Amino acid sequence: EEVLGTYKSRTDEKYSRIVTKFVRQLRHPTRIRETELGDLISDVLKDALGVDIFLLGSGSIRNEQLGPIVTKGDLRECFPYDDAVHLVYVTGAQLKHMFMRMLRDEVWEGAHCEFYQLSRGLLVEYDQATHSFLRFEFEGEPVDDDKVFSLGLQHFHFLNMKDSFDITPEELRKNHSIRVISTSCTQVIEEALQAGQHQNATVARGVVGRRATSRNPIGPSSA
């Protein structure tokens, strides 16, 4: 009993350790829209792993809010899936094809579909009525079909690329070899936040329109 008590005490101490503090609480109210928490975590993984784009499985975020004080336990509860991360390379044309699959009508009609949070730099505006992109930009420039981008994906989503994106690893290997660049995305997130990255006011900017949908071409939306 004494041993168990000591173990519990050490475990409690470990998970109550403060990882970071945000300027305010960040929210993730739905998995089928861009969210503050989705922006934060996708940005952390993009920057820490050095990829052009990180597509974060929206369902990986299990809580509707996090912070402003974030303990190790809070982070693990909010983001419990400790996947490896795969680095793949996609052309602009393939990236657009992947998003067409992700934004198909079934997603908005409540079907069980994967949805993704976008890292900083990628802006997609989609007209649901015409099934076309109004804007598809990277770093402020229209995405060229032939340009190749480095893209980070969690292991689960890498394994399910065909269903989620209607594309296969075999197709992407024609662009470049595929490799694992992290064995623990949770550790990457924790270490980046603990180092003081992504915790200032710019993280808490609200939803900034990295991905927007509209039934009419009304211009950028922050939906």
Each model region followed by its residue ranges:
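Catalytic centers of hydrolytic enzymes
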Residues: E1-A48, D52-A223
